[in-house]
Amino acid sequence: MASSPITDFYAGRNVFITGATGFVGVTIVEKLLRDVPNVGTLYLLMRAKKGKSVQERLEELKKNSVFDKFKELQLQSRLSKIVPIEGDVGLEHLGISPKDRQTLIDNVNVVFHSAATLDFFQSLKETTNINLRGTRRVVELCQQIKNLDALVHVSSAYVNAYLTKVEEKLYPAPEDPEKIIQLSETLNDDALKELEPKLLKDHPNTYTFTKHLAEHEVANVASKFPCGIVRPSMITAAWKEPIPGWTISKNGPQGFFMGASKGVLRRLPLDPSIIMDYIPIDVVVNGIITTGYYVNSLQAKNGGRPADLQIFHLTSSTYKPFRFELMTDKINSYLHDYPLNSAVWYPNLRLVKSLWVFRLSAILFHFIPAIILDLVTKIGGGRPILVRLHKNVWNSLNTLEKFIFTEWHFDSKRLLALSKTLNIVDKKKFFIDIGELAWDEYFSNTILGVRQYLSKEPIKNLEKARRKDKILLGLHVALQLSFWYGVFKLIVCLTGISTAKAALVLPVLYYLFGLL
């Protein structure tokens, strides 16, 4: 049987992972434990949170749905390889105690840095501290590690969002990192906010700006030890592993599928004709793990000297492009294949190309129903949240507009070339080539995954939910008929025209209303 060079590389090696409790980090942990039986210790940077110690949070992490298959595969014992390291990338020296730091220095061989703040609305002071300085702190630790074989930094395809065609290379820093750090230390948030337009230049927000600068922190040490940067685009549910459709992230399509399946999200500001760059989480994780192996192998080929910094795009836009126009009708079909028992209305998602048309339609289809449902919820003793939810979406649209209506083309030739260097075993086990991905099947699985892992509805209540879906359809049709009958009577009453003429006006109104 052919061997797996990637598995062989990680066998016996100890790995330090930041951001380990996040979507990417926890999936890295699962993949290494499942497919690299002899991997060494996995040190996870974790912080005490909400009154829970890191040990308590680790026990919670082990119960994450990403590990659901471990019981079936009898792999629970491998979870003992996980060791929590209390710390925080936002603190000096990563907030790690001297004893734990020495443990990492003495034992770690590979570092995966995936910790970051993903909030597009966070202040420059905070994003600088976590994304830029946090990366610098990780790099400083890496320089102290005695036997470091690879550092892989998880960046983002959107760090160069001011370009619509992006290559797998390092672009010039938009500003001097030292200057940004100094300003963030000396100025308050309000003063920094005033300087933001001048500092960010063409960057749409503080996230892409500070993540771009963070890449240069890694580039500065690429001559000292093997380094790689991976740039995922919008990370979505699992394609194949650990379970097709698995997700714990509400970002991107998972979030709006969740709202649509509830029946509360009915319009979405999105141009179905533009390419949306989505990449499954399992492909991202395989890309990270493969990069760690690859940058180390280059050093061996280079006479023990680190090769140039390696940058790879984990993206789909130029290789397996996806547009919603390919499956607009299918999305609603999938929502009814896997309906929610907790749905409050019949799901019917429509995409709206124009932001101002979306705002108008949101008043009719989001806010008015939300006010009614929140009132009913409040009367019933529940906590009304729908109006607040839709307000948050409304207020964020101006900031998100660039990401909603811009088509990017992220070149991924280097990643595909990397895939071709792998042997047949690693191509299958650590797949990074999405050439065989079928988007329609993928999104069907994603909607089922959203149902199971985000909405927390088990498969066993699916038939019950489908019966409810049919009832909601009947109510939906009845409400529409009642509404248009009321409009018809109102036209006759207000204008005094005959019912025959009113019947001619009604289709025109129906058509115009349908544009919203």
Swiss-Prot record:
Q: Which domain of life is it from?
A: Eukaryota
Gene Ontology CC terms: endomembrane system; membrane; peroxisome
Q: Transmembrane segments in this chain: where?
A: 356-376, 471-491, 496-516
Question: What enzyme class is recorded for this protein?
Answer: oxidoreductase
Which SUPFAM superfamilies is this protein grouped with?
NAD(P)-binding Rossmann-fold domains
Q: Where in the cell is it found?
A: Membrane
> What would be an example GO MF term here?
alcohol-forming long-chain fatty acyl-CoA reductase activity
Substrates-to-products reaction catalysed:
a long-chain fatty acyl-CoA + 2 NADPH + 2 H(+) = a long-chain primary fatty alcohol + 2 NADP(+) + CoA
Q: Which UniProt keywords apply?
A: Lipid biosynthesis, Lipid metabolism, Membrane, NADP, Oxidoreductase, Transmembrane, Transmembrane helix
Disulfide bond among keywords: no
Q: How does it sit in the membrane?
A: Multi-pass membrane protein
GO BP annotations, alphabetical order: long-chain fatty-acyl-CoA metabolic process; wax biosynthetic process
Could you tell me the EC number(s) of this protein? 1.2.1.84
Family from the record: Belongs to the fatty acyl-CoA reductase family.
Function text: Catalyzes the reduction of C16 or C18 fatty acyl-CoA to fatty alcohols.
Q: What is the protein name for this chain? A: Putative fatty acyl-CoA reductase CG8306
